[in-house]
Amino acid sequence: MSDINDISSYDYFLPEMLIAKEPVLPKEEARLLVYLKKTKEIKHYKFKDLASLIPDDAAVIFNNTKVIKARILGHKQSGGACEVMLNQPLGDNKFSVYVRGRVSVGSVLNFADDIKVNVLELNDDGSRVVNFTKNGVILDTAQLFSELEKIGHVPLPPYIKRADTKDDESWYQSIFAKNSGAVAAPTASLHFSEQMLERIKAKHDIAYITLHVGAGTFKGVECQNINDHKMHSEFYELSEKAQEIISSNKPILGVGTTVTRCVEEFARSKQSSGFCKLFLNLNNKPIRQNYLLTNFHLPKSTLIMLVTSFIGLEETMRIYETAVSEKYRFYSYGDGMLVI
C-alpha cells in the first residue's frame, strides 16, 4: 500500500502524445471520464452529457476569473533576451513575477511601448518583487493590465511547447470570465459552451466565485514528504450567492480545483475574500464540497493530491491509469473527469 505522505505515490507515466496542445472543438465534444463514488465505477461520456449527469439537487459553482496576457518578452540592459511572467499584485503598485534568465536586485528590464520592469527584491520561491513603469511613471494594477493587453502574450502552461496564437485568446478563456487577474486558466471551465451553461442553469442553482489563478499552480511539489510543501497564495472573493449556497445544506459541484479550494476556504474561515493557501490532500480533506469536475493533472502536483482528497490515492491512480490506457487528452487543453 502506498504512503500517502510520500511524493512518489502521486507519480504516474504519461506518454507525451497525450498532452493536449490545443482544445477539442466544439468544446462539448471533449471526453468526460465519470467516477461514481458509491460504486467505484468508471464510465465514459462527453462534456455535452454533463447536464444530465449532475445530481438533481446539486448547486454548481464556477470561477469567473479572467486570464490576462501575463507573459511579456523583452531585453535586459545588457541586450540579452528576457521573459517576465506576472504572478500577482502585492499592493502598493508592486507585483510578484517570475523572470526567465538571471536578474539581480536593481536590474531594469526593457519591453515594448517603453514599459520597464524594475527588480526590487528576490524571493525564496524564485519569484521577484518588481514595479512596472511607462515613460518613467509607475503603473498601478489597472494600468498594468491595460498595457499587458497590448504587449503581452497568453500565458500558456509550460508543457504546451509552442508559441501562443490568436486562437489561444479565446481558447484559454472561459465563456463566463469576468474579473481580470488570473495568469492561468481555471481549466475545467474551458469546456463550457453557452448552450451547456444554459442547460445547467435550467436545472440547477449556480453561483460564481473569483479566484485569480497564480503561476504557482504549475509549481511542482519538491518535498519528499508532501506535508512539508509550502502552498502558494491566491486572491479569492465569493459572491453573496456562493456564500449562501456554501452556508446551506445543498450538495455542491465545484467546477475545477480553484472553486474547490475557495469553497473549502470559506467553509473553514467564513471570510468572503482574502488569500487562499489551502492545500487539500488526504491529510486535509474537503468538509463541504461533494462533487468535483476537473481536468487531468500533472504527476506529483497539488492538484492531483486534491483529487485524492475526494476519492483516495488508489482510486485516483486507477482512474489516471484508465485515462492513459483509453488515450484521454491531458492537462489544460485536455479532457476532464467528473467525481459524483
Curated annotation (Swiss-Prot):
Q: Which terms are listed as keywords in the entry? A: Cytoplasm, Queuosine biosynthesis, S-adenosyl-L-methionine, Transferase
GO MF term list: S-adenosylmethionine:tRNA ribosyltransferase-isomerase activity
Q: Name one Pfam family in it.
A: Queuosine_synth
Question: Which SUPFAM superfamilies has this protein been placed in?
Answer: QueA-like
Query: Where found in the cell?
Result: Cytoplasm
Which processes are annotated in GO (biological process)? queuosine biosynthetic process; tRNA wobble guanine modification
Regions crossing the membrane = none
- Which reaction does this chain catalyze? 7-aminomethyl-7-carbaguanosine(34) in tRNA + S-adenosyl-L-methionine = epoxyqueuosine(34) in tRNA + adenine + L-methionine + 2 H(+)
> What cellular component GO annotations does this protein have?
cytoplasm
**Pathway terms, separated by semicolons:** tRNA modification; tRNA-queuosine biosynthesis
Q: What is its main location?
A: cytoplasm
Known EC number(s)? Answer: 2.4.99.17
Task of the protein: Transfers and isomerizes the ribose moiety from AdoMet to the 7-aminomethyl group of 7-deazaguanine (preQ1-tRNA) to give epoxyqueuosine (oQ-tRNA).
Listed under subunit, the entry gives: Monomer.
Query: Which PANTHER family does the UniProt record give?
Result: S-ADENOSYLMETHIONINE:TRNA RIBOSYLTRANSFERASE-ISOMERASE
The entry sums up its family as follows: Belongs to the QueA family.
Quote the HAMAP family the UniProt record gives. Answer: QueA
For this entry, the protein name equals: S-adenosylmethionine:tRNA ribosyltransferase-isomerase
Source organism of this protein record: Campylobacter concisus (strain 13826)
Q: Which gene encodes it?
A: queA
